[in-house]
């Protein structure tokens, strides 16, 4: 597959042809291009779904340790803490700023190969963040507060690594600079994948979780089960496919019909891999030198 590269000339959109759009739409598109964009991979619902899937695959030992570490949380479950890392900017701005680059990785264009020196300087990317936090969680010598924080980071970051645009390209800031129109409003491709692709299924969280649990586990879920770099590289491969970058600014229902099955599969895989990671990190002796 080849990457469909978009340019401004690709779009007969509101920003380029004012005669074809209303002024409010033009201003909405312009505003969305200028404002900073939060990187909430999958959105709150998607992260809760990944966590819910993982919870169903925990070993009794891992489940007990998760419950112990999360004791005192408002919702002491994996789903309940699955968006904690995104909420840091509100309840702990310093940690939120320090961890901002841990949610994604910008990979090499056209081949999606991860090269640590080029793509993760100082270890500030989702791949190395997962490796670090897994080590902290597994280390029983660490204080419970440190291990609980590592658990909350992991629940979120594993989901992030499976959202294709969190393993995309620096050139377009993971789709943030790709301006699109959805239901007459301006947004961007990253935001579309953060929430609207999942929302297009029109299912509440409980129903969506059952839907994903009934899905056969994709074969690729067992590949690189403990290799976050492989997860990100596989996520990036979707960005390379024809049609991932829409041919026109206006998003039609056909886009969701084509790509929602991919999103569902990625959520299913993320839940399975998160469970495998937690089961391994929380087994007896996992953190011993």
Across the structure, where does each feature detected by a protein language model lie?
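Bacterial N-terminal signal peptides
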Residues: 22-36
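N-terminal secretory signal peptides that target proteins for export/translocation
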Residues: 1-19
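N-terminal, motif-rich segments that launch catalysis or mediate targeting to/interaction with membranes
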Residues: 40-157, 164-289
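Structural motif marking the loop-to-transmembrane transition
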Residues: 19-22, 147
């Amino acid at each position: 597959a080849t990457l469909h590269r978009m340019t401004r000339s690709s779009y007969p959109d509101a920003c380029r042809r004012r005669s074809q759009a209303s002024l409010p739409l033009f201003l909405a598109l312009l505003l969305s291009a200028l404002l900073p964009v939060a990187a909430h991979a999958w959105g709150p619902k998607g992260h809760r779904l990944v966590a819910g899937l993982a919870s169903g695959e925990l070993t009794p030992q891992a489940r007990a340790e998760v419950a112990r570490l999360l004791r005192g949380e408002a919702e002491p479950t994996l789903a309940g803490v699955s968006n904690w890392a995104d909420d840091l900017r509100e309840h702990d701005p310093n940690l939120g700023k320090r961890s901002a680059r841990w949610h994604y990785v910008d990979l090499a264009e056209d081949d999606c190969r991860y090269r640590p020196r080029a793509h993760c300087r100082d270890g500030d990317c989702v791949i190395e963040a997962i490796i670090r936090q897994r080590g902290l969680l597994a280390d029983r010598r660490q204080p419970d507060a440190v291990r609980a924080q590592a658990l909350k980071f992991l629940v979120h970051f594993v989901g992030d690594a499976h959202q294709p645009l969190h393993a995309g390209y620096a050139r377009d800031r993971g789709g943030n600079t790709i301006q699109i129109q959805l239901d007459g409003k301006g947004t961007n491709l990253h935001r579309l994948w953060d929430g609207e692709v999942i929302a297009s299924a029109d299912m509440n969280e409980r129903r969506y979780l059952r839907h994903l649990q009934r899905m056969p586990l994709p074969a690729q879920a067992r590949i690189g089960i403990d290799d976050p770099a492989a997860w990100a590289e596989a996520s990036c491969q979707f960005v390379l496919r024809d049609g991932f970058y829409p041919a026109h600014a206006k998003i039609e229902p056909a886009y969701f019909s084509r790509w929602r099955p991919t999103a569902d599969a990625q959520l299913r895989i993320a839940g399975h891999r998160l469970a495998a990671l937690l089961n391994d990190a929380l087994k007896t002796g996992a953190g011993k030198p």
